[in-house]
Amino acid sequence: MQKQRFCLDTTAITDSDVRKSLGVSNISESAEKIMDIIAQARVQLDISCHIPYDTVYKELVGFLTREGCAPETLIKVDTWLVKKTPNRYEIKIPAEIFYEYIKDLRERINKGMRISENAMYETALEAYILSKPDEKDREDVLNEVLSKTVNSFRVKYRNALRGGTLDSAPDLDVLLLAKELDAAVVANDEGIEKWAQRLGLRFVNARDFPFILQEYLDLWDKK
């Protein structure tokens, strides 16, 4: 049987869906539970869980530290997650993937520009409507209109440019390391999932990951 390897994104440990699936209320509890299952799977079944170093590793440790996780949990992260830097100079990626990525990025930039233009038109129109009836104070009009428009713009712009694509070095490192090791990608990130599929990589949703490992362990215990 081929050795099972998993490559973890930060969301594999920190995502809110993971906490819900485990029935816990905070990251400290969910991180400790997941790390205990990973440890058992490593010792009993030789299943290895990898994390890109230092991009994703630093991101994960920083997040857990800010959330007040116990030092013991951070020690488990260091002990049971295999830290490795992807061999970025040797991993071969088909040129078609780069073509698709650039095309996707260009479409997103154009969409973001259209959203920006619409936001400016909406701001001007609302400012005119609000100021006309009773000649409101100029600053009040600007504050009222801009706060509303900017908040709406941020949401739309973020979704247009970042939703469903790779938008950070850690995201890319997860895919590169998974390809190098022939490992399954574990994440709760639409962009990582989309590009994992395009690269022909196995993908496991973060909320399902602990239960998959537990299923392996339960079956082993029945032997």
Swiss-Prot record:
Enzyme nomenclature, EC number: 3.1.26.5
EC class of the enzyme, as a word: hydrolase
Cited Pfam families: PIN_5
GO molecular function: ribonuclease P activity
Reaction equations catalysed: Endonucleolytic cleavage of RNA, removing 5'-extranucleotides from tRNA precursor
Keyword tags: Endonuclease, Hydrolase, Nuclease, tRNA processing
One annotated GO biological process: tRNA 5'-leader removal
Cited PANTHER family: RNA-FREE RIBONUCLEASE P, UPF0278 PROTEIN TK1425
Biological role stated in the UniProt entry: RNA-free RNase P that catalyzes the removal of the 5'-leader sequence from pre-tRNA to produce the mature 5'-terminus.
Family: Belongs to the HARP family.
Protein name: RNA-free ribonuclease P
Species: Methanococcus maripaludis (strain DSM 14266 / JCM 13030 / NBRC 101832 / S2 / LL)
Phylogenetic placement of the source organism: Archaea, Methanobacteriati, Methanobacteriota, Methanomada group, Methanococci
